[in-house]
């Protein structure tokens, strides 16, 4: 009977030592790796075109650097491949490299927003494209209620369908349309290549023609002067004849 408590003590000691050893052997969780926007989009599985544009414009690297160094965070609105396919043919190819950069930056806000934040945010919301053009706002307008949030550019309007990530410092929301800024695609936008409207000026050739017509005597004037000359000649002839008879 005396050996039973001793046996229990030994088993308890063995159990405790095993627990301590296991705790020491368990590796401590390492720090989380840097956030990568491309990796997040690749995991989403329907953003091939957007990833390509992020790489060719180098905006993907800029986002990664700013996300991991800024305290404000960022919000990305990610158009799907279908969204790009629904654009008019040649829309992207017609854009200059600088305009392509502005188009992608227009989908990025330099601040972290939850869906709840976007429902009460002051419009227009600044984007990374804001301030790149003189007088260009490049802002986004958010409206909605409940869990539905809509975004409008002045040219297109769509809703934020799903969230790929909504954790500081980065929020990524899926949109079903490419966000076209009014500064680039609005109806009132004048193409920089369009010639300026010509001011209507008097035609020099018309003036010269009219002056020639004014200077040239009309047919009636010509006939009138001819008749006058004929009358004067007859009168002088009669005077000469009368003088001859008198003399």
UniProtKB/Swiss-Prot annotation:
Residues 225-247 form a propeptide. Its main location: membrane. Belongs to the fasciclin-like AGP family. The keyword Calcium does not apply. InterPro entries: FAS1_dom_sf, FAS1_domain, FLA_A. The keyword Membrane applies. Glycans are attached at residues 36, 55, 68, 141, 150. This is Fasciclin-like arabinogalactan protein 13. Residues 1-25 form the signal peptide. Residues 189-228 are annotated as: Disordered. Keywords: Cell membrane, Glycoprotein, GPI-anchor, Lipoprotein, Membrane, Proteoglycan, Signal. May be a cell surface adhesion protein. The gene is FLA13. It comes from the Eukaryota. Pfam families: Fasciclin.
């Amino acid at each position: 009977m005396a050996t039973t408590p001793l046996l229990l003590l030994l088993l308890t000691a063995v159990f405790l030592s095993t627990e301590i050893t296991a705790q020491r052997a368990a590796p401590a969780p390492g720090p989380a790796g840097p956030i990568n926007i491309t990796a997040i989009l690749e995991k989403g599985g329907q953003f091939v075109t957007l990833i390509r544009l992020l790489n060719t414009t180098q905006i993907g690297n800029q986002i990664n650097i700013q996300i991991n160094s800024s305290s404000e965070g960022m919000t990305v609105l990610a158009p799907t491949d279908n969204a790009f396919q629904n654009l008019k043919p040649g829309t992207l190819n017609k854009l200059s490299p600088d305009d392509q950069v502005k188009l992608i930056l227009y989908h990025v806000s330099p601040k972290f927003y939850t869906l709840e934040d976007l429902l009460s945010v002051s419009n227009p919301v600044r984007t990374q494209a804001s301030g790149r053009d003189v007088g260009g706002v490049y802002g986004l307008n958010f409206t909605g209620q409940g869990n539905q949030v809509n975004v409008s550019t002045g040219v297109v309007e769509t809703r934020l369908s799903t969230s790929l990530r909504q954790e500081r410092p980065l929020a990524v929301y899926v949109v079903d349309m490419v966000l076209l800024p009014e500064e680039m695609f609005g109806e009132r936008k004048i193409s920089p290549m369009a010639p300026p409207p010509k001011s209507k000026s008097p035609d020099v050739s018309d003036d010269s023609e009219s002056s020639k017509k004014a200077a040239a005597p009309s047919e009636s004037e010509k006939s009138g002067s001819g008749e006058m000359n004929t009358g004067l000649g007859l009168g002088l002839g009669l005077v000469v004849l009368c003088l001859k008879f008198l003399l």
